[in-house]
Amino acid sequence: MVSSFRVQQAAREIRAGAVIAYPTEAVWGLGCDPWNEDAVYRLLALKSRPVDKGLILIADNIRQFDFLFEDFPEDWIERMGSTWPGPNTWLVPHQDLLPEWVTGKHDTVALRVTDHPQVRELCALVGPLISTSCNPGGRPAAKTRLRVEQYFHGQLDLVLGGALGGRKNPSVIRNLATGEVVRPG
């Protein structure tokens, strides 16, 4: 486990506009502040990912997403809450409360409450984060720090060390309104 000092350092870097790599439940992730347009576009450029695809937001608890839930039916909130923290990502209506560089061309945004202790600590310090697999477009997601360095040598502001969470597959993605599984886990 990485020290709290390193997590606090990562939080400071993110607040200053950094793009970082960090271990998640199954693979290494790239992340940044979702409200920092320059950081998000830099992350997208590193991945060669089009902005219109949208990105996932992660948090350490469901309350960090409260600003999105004001008009949601209570059963939607209960449905999400019953699966978090954990490997469940929900597509929820964003109601134009998030910038287009996060949502892409979609009227929904992908949300997950992580169960990786280090990432939860980081989100507790900075709020929700962009989280996407650590890989250039078309390449497999990094499963080791060495692969992170090989993919993005010198291009990241910080690589937060630590262990993966032990999951073999990425999170399942479901549409909150319909229950449809968009991506199996």
Swiss-Prot record:
InterPro entries: DHBP_synth_RibB-like_a/b_dom (IPR017945), Sua5-like_dom (IPR006070), TC-AMP_synthase (IPR023535), TC-AMP_synthase_SUA5 (IPR050156)
Entry keyword annotation includes Signal: no
Reaction equations catalysed: L-threonine + hydrogencarbonate + ATP = L-threonylcarbamoyladenylate + diphosphate + H2O
Listed Gene3D superfamilies: DHBP synthase
Keyword Zinc: no
GO cellular component, one term: cytoplasm
The protein's Enzyme Commission number: 2.7.7.87
First-level EC class: transferase
Compartments where located: Cytoplasm
Record key words, sorted: ATP-binding, Cytoplasm, Nucleotide-binding, Nucleotidyltransferase, Transferase, tRNA processing
GO molecular function terms noted in the UniProt entry: ATP binding; double-stranded RNA binding; L-threonylcarbamoyladenylate synthase; tRNA binding
Domain YrdC-like: 4-185
One BP term from GO: regulation of translational fidelity
PANTHER family, alphabetized: SUA5, THREONYLCARBAMOYL-AMP SYNTHASE
Known role: Required for the formation of a threonylcarbamoyl group on adenosine at position 37 (t(6)A37) in tRNAs that read codons beginning with adenine. Catalyzes the conversion of L-threonine, HCO(3)(-)/CO(2) and ATP to give threonylcarbamoyl-AMP (TC-AMP) as the acyladenylate intermediate, with the release of diphosphate.
Family under the similarity heading: Belongs to the SUA5 family. TsaC subfamily.
Official protein name in the record: Threonylcarbamoyl-AMP synthase
